Amino acid sequence: RSRPWLWTCMVLFQALFPQAELIIDRFHIVTQVNRALNRARIGFMNTLKKANDLKAKRDYRKLKKYWKLILKKEELLNGTEYRYHRLFKGTVTERGIIDYILSLDESLRLNYNAYQTIVFTVTHRKPDLFRSFIHEKQQGLSAKMDQALKTFRQSERAIVNALSYDYSNGLVEGINNKIKVIKRTAYGYRNFSNFRNRIFIEYKLLETKTAA
């Protein structure tokens, strides 16, 4: 199996800048386990889809509807406010919904716990906890989650740096997104120079001529 592109880039930059300390953007750390948990959820949903009983179909719909809640930070789940939810045919809290969903499948619960642990270490900058968790022997995780943790072990130093320092490529990502919006709203640019000038104008790097 080929190594992830992120690992390849890290090896390349380490060779080009041997004295530099690499830092992986925290967004990409969370994205890895986010996708792994989503894949585990969908895998379990497919199992329920093949079942013929009514309960399995109802649980399938719950897993489909509450996918965002499954990805929500556990510490932000509301456990006191009861609201009516049609799929539960009654009032239930966010915490109650998650507890029910996790009770359906042990593998999903284990993947959920792994996801939440990584999210917690990133959110609260806990490099020691992160390092300890990725080196623990984890049982019952999906292949995708196992691969994510393996990637973390390969990139351990760069991730620990990310949890120890405030550096981020968020500014660069913001610029890239704005450039994409400029291109989309203009329905593309045939002339690269015009496209470049439009970007410079947006960022006030180029003066515009006004009619006399």
Language-model-detected regions and their locations in the chain:
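Catalytic center-proximal scaffold of phosphoryl-transfer enzymes
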Residues: 1-164, 168, 175, 187-212
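Arg/Lys-rich, often Gly-containing low-complexity segments of ribosomal proteins
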Residues: 182
